[in-house]
């Protein structure tokens, strides 16, 4: 490429940048057909159903926001920290996505917020009618965790 060609190419590029470069952004929150929100409390070995899927469909999780707060001091039965996570109840409670963790003796008021990780094109349920749940990996011997959530995605065949 000669100097005049290079100068012309740089000039064309400068004009294109000044006018803006067309960019397509895909936001999973705008591509979803299902939005569910709710709240619940996890105690002992409990779970929370966050997305009850019809028998002839699967969930396709595209995004979520979760806030979790210890509302009564925890005492994990194992004495180890525990992970709050989404699970697929049709596949032996297969972990779908981690949400966050609490120490085994987290005090009242301990909290975290998990905001919209990149799930790519989504995480699909393993079977028709599989529900999406939230659980705490360790059994809770005492205390509880209040969880508030919003999940979105699609229900697919």
PLM-predicted stretches and their roles:
Residues 1-27:
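Short, low-complexity N-terminal tether/leader segments at secretion or assembly junctions of large
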Residues 3, 7, 26-56, 71-76, ...:
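C-terminal interaction-tip segments
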Residues 10-13, 62, 97:
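Extended low-polarity, hydrophobic cluster-rich segments
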Residues 37-40, 95-107:
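Solvent-exposed serine/threonine-rich low-complexity stretches and specific carbohydrate-binding patches
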Residues 55-63:
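Extended extracellular/luminal ectodomain segments enriched in beta-structured repeat modules
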Residues 72-97:
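Short, surface-exposed beta-strand/strand-loop-strand elements in extracellular ectodomains
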């Amino acid at each position: 490429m000669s100097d005049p060609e290079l100068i012309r190419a740089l000039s064309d590029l400068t004009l294109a940048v000044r006018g803006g470069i067309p960019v397509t952004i895909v936001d999973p929150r705008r591509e979803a057909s299902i939005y569910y929100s709710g709240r619940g409390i996890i105690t002992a070995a409990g779970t929370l159903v966050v997305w009850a899927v019809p028998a002839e469909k699967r969930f396709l999780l595209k995004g979520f926001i979760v806030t979790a707060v210890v509302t009564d001091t925890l005492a994990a039965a194992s004495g180890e920290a525990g992970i709050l996570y989404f699970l697929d109840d049709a596949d032996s409670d297969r972990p779908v996505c981690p949400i966050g963790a609490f120490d085994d003796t987290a005090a009242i008021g301990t909290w975290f917020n998990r905001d919209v990780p990149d799930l790519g094109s989504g995480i699909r349920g393993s079977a028709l009618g599989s529900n999406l749940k939230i659980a705490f990996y360790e059994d809770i011997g005492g205390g509880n965790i209040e969880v508030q959530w919003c999940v979105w995605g699609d229900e697919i065949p």
